[in-house]
């Protein structure tokens, strides 16, 4: 995985004063949230979907039913853009068109890979569950068979913050 910002496919941030370059801070944002939005490419059209996820320090994982539009799109084109943001709000102004968004955001690019290895699939599901609960679960084979686990191998990350 590349270091943040410097090799982002969309280039550097225009506002360098808002860029997050500290990888520890970027990872903290990723770990602190539970929901991310993933953008997929469906032919010539974008497709955006929110998913619950987990982060193992190098990759993101989410789960899904084995069928559906998201799965079909990933099978055709596994390029993914993802967005995770925290500390949302707005900064008021006395001037029209001068209100601003308060946030800390990570946007990344990656490749979506279907996890086929049973041990990795269970590890990923354990990470996702641990993100929401302290309970430990067993996964009946029927549940594992009907659940797709997708790993996003991160290619680039870019962090930005404002008003926080």
Which residue stretches match the model-derived regions?
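Charged, gly/pro-rich active-site loop segments
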Residues: 1-17, 87-164
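Short beta-strand segments
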Residues: 33-66
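Anion-coordinating catalytic cores for phosphoryl-, nucleotidyl-, and glycosidic chemistry
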Residues: 18, 27, 69-72, 82
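Short, basic/aromatic recognition patches
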Residues: 9-37
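Short, intrinsically disordered, mixed-charge
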Residues: 31, 75-80, 127-134
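Well-ordered beta-strand positions
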Residues: 52-54, 75, 153
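Short conserved beta-strand and strand-loop elements enriched in small hydrophobics
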Residues: 38, 80-84
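Compact nucleic-acid interaction/catalytic patches
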Residues: 60-80
